[in-house]
Amino acid sequence: MYFTGFADEAGKEIDTQIRATKELGWRFIEARQVGDRNIHDLDDAAFDAVCEKLSQAGISVNCFGSTIANWGKAITDPFDSSLAEARRAIPRMKRLGTRLIRIMSFAVLKDRPPDDQMEEERFRRVGLLTRMFLDEGLQPVHENCMNYGGMGWTYTLRLLERCPGLKLVFDTGNPVFSDDRTKPPPYPKQSSWEFYQHVRDHVVYVHIKDGTWDPATGRIRYTFAGEGDGDVRRIVTDLLRRGYDGGFSIEPHLGAVFHDPTVETEAETRFRTYVEYGRRFARLVEECQKSLQQ
């Protein structure tokens, strides 16, 4: 078991991301944004510079937090851009010695019901992307987010059935604000524990996020791990009980909300919040481990 995180929430530049990781005493980063671009979209010179700085610092990238087929990509859009992102990511993952890459299953078509989401085209595209990575010895992991698989655990299982070799990264916080489309409308929010229970046999990686849903504002209020409704402590304990030895990747959303560029804090506050989040979560894991020894 190891700790990692979306260090771009500590700071945009790779130097800051490395500094936060080293302050936590960790050896890994889940690489997403460097500057204003995803790691698979950096120009060659910028990527070379990132590789050199990581190497000098002794920090490794355990996963590419790619934008491939994510919530910003429509299934009705041409597939070419997703294929191009995958082709750019593969050689960069190999250079960094990174085996995991986070992908999704395209945005939910909000004007259509759950049973009319162009499933077959989604399965075709995600299946092709999965094979592209597997053929190169790399492992794609699907995140339950604002995408087809994130509509509920039944949709995730259907996706896995139709895309052989695809595995899961389970995000503890996303169900808190996601409609549960396995149930009839008006859709309630999902239960992280319920979702996790149904898909845990396929989980090889975990994103740690937490929060509470505010019906009055229609927004999620992000919290430190274990302080919200994401069932973080319960899920972590169950994973450890089952012998989980993969990564826990923190995605605080407290000092920087990646999906909303209007939410900003001062640079040092972002940095300190990320480090504090990591320290608190490490203590939570230690407490979960001790509870299993009692």
Model-assigned labels for residue ranges:
Residues 64, 128-229, 286, 292:
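Acidic/histidine-rich catalytic cores of soluble enzymes
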Residues 13-19, 55-56, 72-170, 177, ...:
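Active-site acidic/histidine proton-transfer and metal-coordination neighborhood
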Residues 1-7, 29-31, 61-66, 101-103, ...:
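Hydrophobic faces of well-ordered beta-strands that scaffold small-molecule active sites
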Residues 30-55, 106-111:
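Glycine-rich, proline-tolerant flexible connector loops at the mouths of alpha/beta enzymes
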Residues 255-294:
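Aromatic-rich peripheral "rim/lid" segments of glycoside hydrolase catalytic domains that contact
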Residues 18-24, 41-63, 87-97, 127-135, ...:
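Acidic (Asp/Glu)-rich catalytic clusters
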Residues 42-49, 79-87, 115-127, 153-154, ...:
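Charged helix-capping and loop-helix junction motifs
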Residues 9-11, 33-35, 67-70, 105-110, ...:
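Active-site-proximal loop/turn and secondary-structure-junction residues that shape catalytic pockets
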